[in-house]
Design a protein with these regions (language model features):
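Conserved AAA+ ATPase "sensor/coupling" helix adjacent to the nucleotide-binding pocket
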Residues: 179, 183, 280-287, 530-535
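P-loop NTPase catalytic phosphate-binding loop
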Residues: 68-192, 200-269, 286, 347-512, ...
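Generic detector of well-ordered alpha-helical segments enriched in charged/polar residues
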Residues: 31-39, 170, 258, 275-279, ...
């Protein structure tokens, strides 16, 4: 650039060439402004409230949630912690509990691997660590991975039943029906309600929670119980009985049964459209792909995370330790599901031996109660069957049980020597020729109760002449005046039929009472049995028979030696 004066002379000259300066690009201006503000805020330690809370962690623990939310259990109100839910609209995260006592039956939904067993274990753990075993009892049917067996030793848990234990499953439902019938009668004066009974002066009785893990597996194997479950779950809450089921899909539980379940807990489904089948108004909302995440419908629809009882890798060990500690704390042990013992022993029956009105002989197969007979009603009692020689173990074991009771003396006449005398201990067992002497001896002793068993009496009488037979039958008939003597007549049904018309027998024996050994009871007409012949024609196993009481026959497993 040249500067000139007024006559054209150069006054000053400048060089306009500039050096190129490279400036680093830092992006758009608005971005740099924001970054500058953020950096300045950090330096000045300035912050503003977040729009939402941090997401719930993948691993949360029941005990930590109890402390965080100051959870306090209420006696007889079963409301266990199951996790924590997120309510971003109101910027809050809240404790998630399952109001079992209030809302009752519950279904836990979720695809395989979604955390259903975690949810069930959380329900059990939170309940047993917050309530006494007098308040709540669990009966668990584990048709899944069988991980719930870790709770087996808790005093609150009556039984953990696996898929192969058919007898226990049968007996559980019998027991539930019995409990409900008993409570119906018990609650008559308390508005027919468990809650009203508990809160208004009734005795403490536990809520019963029946938990079925993998209910579709249960119903596939035992589909005969679907209708019964529908009947029980319809009104069971008012009797203090609650069902909790877990299932893989939204339609695996039929609507007729599903309508009896008020609460739904939904974990992850493989198909996003399945959420709307269970939760109305869910739209496109889905839980995060995290184990134990799910959706729950409360005031709105919220995502939740299931709580762990303990660190996953040590969960089983921890739960077993807790169960052992609870055993030392809780005085009451939940009643186990009764089962028919493999061997009915004297130790099992002896406490039921109250008096001659209740003499135990075995276990009722249907009710699993101790079967008893009444020896006090008449002077004689009959034990019969098509073949008595196959039931000698029962006869020997039963007589030893009678002999073990103070004040009772037992004697046996074994006409055909079918018993093993070595198995009778100190019981006197004589041959047929000692019948008269034995009768005279026991009639003379009025201080003791005498149980006198005569086997194959018909063969004894058939060998006697008219005079001797008259003398023996006269002695037998004398028992009606001896209240301390009871004669047990053991013979085949054909022989019982032969002597049933004789006066000494008719006077002292009731044919609507007695014991039948083995099969064939439906083929005879000597004993007065009113039970359906269709029932009586069923095949009877070894060591089984019928106790006949007032004409009704009850299938019974007999006492045998241990």
């Amino acid at each position: 650039v040249n500067f000139l004066d007024n006559v054209g002379n150069y006054i000053k000259t400048f060089d306009t060439k500039q050096n190129d300066i490279v400036v680093e690009s830092k992006g758009e201006e608005i971005t740099n402004i924001v970054n500058y503000i953020v950096q300045t805020a950090k330096e000045e330690n300035v912050s503003i409230p977040q729009l939402w809370l941090p997401r719930i962690p993948n691993m949360i623990y029941t005990e930590e949630l109890k402390a965080k939310y100051n959870y306090q259990a209420v006696t007889n109100n079963i409301n266990p912690i199951i996790g924590e839910y997120d309510d971003p609209d109101n910027q809050r995260q809240m404790l998630l509990t399952l109001p079992i006592s209030k809302e009752g039956n519950t279904i836990v939904y979720g695809s395989a691997g979604s955390g259903k067993e975690l949810m069930l274990s959380s329900i059990i753990y939170s309940t047993i660590t917050s309530h006494d075993s007098k308040e709540v009892n669990f009966y668990i049917l584990d048709f899944g991975a069988e991980t719930l067996t870790m709770f087996r030793n808790a005093p609150h848990v009556g039984d953990v039943i696996l898929s192969t234990e058919k007898e226990k499953i049968d007996n559980l439902f019998k027991m539930l029906n019995q409990i409900i019938e008993e409570r119906k009668k018990l609650f008559v004066d308390y508005n027919g309600s468990y809650d009203f009974y508990i809160n208004h002066g009734g005795k403490q009785i536990p809520s019963i929670i029946v938990m079925i893990n993998n209910v579709e597996g249960f119903l596939d194997t035992y589909n005969e119980y679907e209708e019964l479950m529908g009947q029980i779950t319809r009104d069971c809450l008012k009797y203090g009985v609650i069902f909790i089921l877990s299932t893989n899909g939204p339609n695996t539980v039929r609507y007729r049964l599903r309508q009896n379940f008020k609460q739904n807990v939904v974990l992850q489904f493989n198909d996003a459209s399945d959420y709307g089948t269970i939760i109305a108004g869910v739209r496109k909302k889905e839980p995060s792909k995290v184990y134990g995440r799910g959706l729950i419908a409360l005031e709105g629809i919220y995502e939740f995370q299931t709580a762990y009882a303990y660190k996953e890798e040590k969960l089983t060990e921890y739960v077993k330790i807790i169960c052992e500690k609870l055993q030392t704390i809780c005085e009451y042990q939940a009643k186990s599901v009764p089962t028919l013992p493999e061997v009915v022993t004297s130790s099992l029956l002896k406490n039921s031996f109250v008096n001659l009105q209740q003499v135990p002989v075995g276990v009722n197969k249907e009710t699993l109660a101790i079967s008893t007979i009444n020896l006090a009603a008449t002077g004689m009692y009959t034990i019969t069957g098509e073949d008595i020689s196959s039931s000698t173990q029962f006869l020997e074991s039963w007589m030893k049980l009678l002999q073990s009771r103070d004040g009772i003396k037992c004697n046996i006449i074994d006409a055909n020597n079918i018993l093993n005398k070595n198995n009778l201990g100190d019981i006197k067992c004589s041959d047929a020729d000692q019948l008269e002497n034995t009768l005279n001896e026991i009639y003379e002793d009025t201080k003791s109760v005498h149980i006198f068993m005569i086997l194959n009496i018909n063969s004894i009488l058939n060998k006697l002449n008219v005079t001797d037979k008259g003398r023996i039958t006269g002695l037998l008939d004398k028992v009606k005046s001896k209240t301390n003597v009871k004669i047990i007549i053991v013979d085949t049904i054909d022989n019982i039929k032969t002597i049933s018309y004789e006066p000494w027998f008719k006077t002292n024996v009731s044919l609507s009472e007695g014991i039948w050994l083995g099969n064939g009871i439906a083929n005879q007409f000597t004993l007065k049995v009113t039970t359906s012949s269709r029932v009586l024609r069923a095949e009877v196993e070894t060591n089984f028979g019928y106790v006949i009481t007032k004409g009704k026959a009850a299938l019974t497993k007999w006492i045998t030696e241990e």
